[in-house]
Amino acid sequence: MDYYQSELIKLFQKSNEIYKDNNFETKLNEKNYKFLLVYLNSIHSILKIDMKLNIYQYINIEFKELILISKELMKIVFDIIHSGTWNNIDILFKDLFAYSSILYIYSFFLIQFKNIKVDNNNNNNININIPNPIKKIILKKLDLALIFGDKLFNQVINQIINLISNNNNNNNNNFLNNFKNENYNNNNENEIILNKEKLIKRISRPPSLNEFKNEYMIKGNPCVIENLMKEWPCFNERNWSDLNYLKNVAGSRLVPIEIGPNYLHEKMKQKLINFNKFIDEYIISKNSDDDNDDIGYLAQTKLFEQIPQLRNDILIPEYCKIKIGCGDDDNDNNKEDNVEINAWLGPKGTVTPLHYDPKHNFLCQIVGRKYIKLFSPKESNNLYPHLNSKLFFNTSMVDVENPDHSKFPLFKNCDYIELILNAGEILYIPPTYWHFVKSLSQSFSIFP
């Protein structure tokens, strides 16, 4: 047995241990989903896996039947997790989708091993040569598992991806030579004249944790923090302003994007797309004269759980770990691993409608510039939220750029503050503070 097979089997064994340790069978029985156990038991029976035994001895079993069963299981669980509102779907089924994807990939791999070569180079490193058609199928299935699954199997899935991508080092230079040096085109940015009496407070010297907590978080005062991000790798040796770098790291991966003027628009839709294709079609080729109905952007996605290499390019501001509330221990801040990080990447002209979020927000601008207009929670009654909507109750009905004052008369006298957020700056937005955002250029931001 070669190195590649043995490493894959170890990861598969690890996923089975996770399955057992988290009592999937008991939970499925309790939720009256016993029919799913029929599929799972059939899969384990084909593999003849007893969790107490070593699965190495079963390497030569015929796995075609396993592929059919695991594929059917994936389809059934996929339908379950898309049968209702995403946030209300039981995490158990999201985890089960990820596990069934691992089962499918494992059986698929073992059938395809005859097409996979493993070479040792002079440095005793392992080069795994997987034909591109096979690699595309594998990466697509694993990306779907990361996108639609929960976090339980993420580490195993990313380790499998790293294993099959282990031969990238020798191919990176050839890959980069296949396209011209491409970067964001931000030469034609919109110029916005700000009201000097409505400017947000800017902090050039990052405050201490206690100072920031007491003066901004507890009091609910938004601000812009400057000079805090300049040491991040994404501004230096792994620069995100270089699209070649982003393509090299994530080019072959499948990512979810949104297409349309904004999330309230009737033509709004979602799409899964190859990252390279997204960059070429929606970032590089996009200009301000294009139809906004076809504008595409990557928004509020768990990109860094899916592609940990990009996660290593950023740092989490210590302010994000401050706890606010009764009984909180100032010395017991949240661990960095528990901080949820969303990514936003899109072209010039994209708009996020006026809305509020229930938690503390830190908008970290990495590439490009954004115009942002903020309204205090005290103005909520004058901002006309969608009160009758379960999805958009936190979003205003007012078009901030072209308000209809006859329909929304109270909006005209609302107090506000505004700013242009530049690359390298962090905007702190307190909970329930209303904010409208528009990209003045092609833009990459994160929200820890």
Swiss-Prot record:
A Gene Ontology molecular function term of the record: 2-oxoglutarate-dependent dioxygenase activity
InterPro entries tied to this protein: Cupin_8, JmjC_dom
Pfam families, A to Z: Cupin_8
Entry-linked Gene3D superfamilies: Cupin (2.60.120.650)
JmjC domain location: 305-448
Official protein name in the record: JmjC domain-containing protein D
